[in-house]
């Protein structure tokens, strides 16, 4: 396999991604499937490739990711976060560019739990005055 590979763990909502990058031709594999096949929506594919575009490394690295949990956009965000960390492991000079783009910070927004006595997390039952 690759002589030197760099690793990053990414998380978003309930999705967790393990991302390995190695110098190559720009091949992206997610759960042993190509990027186009794994993500049907173009927006999800764009989210995954954003760190590469921000650092002008689109066809410089081969990416192999395994991702579990969450939906398609949560998984795409987790891969983006892991890819960002892997790129920083490869070259620490990329950190400032990636931070300016907002990819270094983990998006901490999670689903709020449903509370007892309410219909959803915050939706209350209809109020009747009389």
Curated annotation (Swiss-Prot):
Transcription regulation: is it a keyword of this entry? no
Underlying gene: rpsI
Record-stated family: Belongs to the universal ribosomal protein uS9 family.
The keyword ATP-binding appears for this protein: no
PROSITE patterns referenced in this protein's UniProt entry, alphabetically: RIBOSOMAL_S9
Q: What is this protein called?
A: Small ribosomal subunit protein uS9
What are the GO BP annotations of this UniProt entry?
translation
- GO molecular function annotation: RNA binding; structural constituent of ribosome
> What GO CC annotations are associated with the protein?
cytosolic small ribosomal subunit
Q: Which organism is it from?
A: Teredinibacter turnerae (strain ATCC 39867 / T7901)
- Keywords per UniProt: Ribonucleoprotein, Ribosomal protein
Could you tell me which HAMAP family the record lists for this protein?
Answer: Ribosomal_uS9_B (MF_00532_B)
The record, for InterPro entries, names:
Ribosomal_Su5_D2-typ_SF (IPR020568), Ribosomal_uS9 (IPR000754), Ribosomal_uS9_bac/plastid (IPR023035), Ribosomal_uS9_CS (IPR020574), Ribsml_uS5_D2-typ_fold_subgr (IPR014721)
Question: Can you tell me where the transmembrane regions are?
Answer: none
